[in-house]
Amino acid sequence: MVRMISREPTIERLAQAEALLLQPFGLTDASLTRALATIGEHRIDDADLYFQSTRHEGWSLEEGIVKSGSFSIDQGVGVRAVAGEKTAFAYSDDISEAALLDAARTVRTIAASGQSRRVKLGMRPSVAASRVLYAPTDPIATLDSTQKVALLEKVEKLARSRDPRIVQVMAGVAAEYDVVLVAREIGRAHV
């Protein structure tokens, strides 16, 4: 597995995370502040908002033919609050201000009850769900489908050229692009 580590300055990575995880869904710093303030209505020691988008793509070639391809996008928001030794956590696959505030209220209620719990909130359709969600520097997007198939064919040709006894070649390529943004009361901590 090859990991691509971005060497871009943190500010640029933050801007990319905001462009992928906040802006398409109409979320702003004010939205994050409202959610954190909602959690803070109960006495808590710590709270954070965790946004994540993961894109996966895979291709496989067998006997000179592309046999399968896969593509998936998983995204959502999680809200966590810590009160004493208890942790409350709520999450949703929907990234929207309504889902964020629902999760914040749920976490506040759990924390106020003195329990440690995890709650998955229901999915709501999102206006941005049909939009293009990938940052221009997404490494998966650096090659189009034709180029990915050509890469697999090149691997097959190279393998067969090494030894005439090679009668079957199976090749695959898979990639995953993950973007995370964590917001805390004192400001964003990680991208």
Where are these regions (language model features)?
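Active-site bordering "gate/hinge" segments
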Residues: 1-190
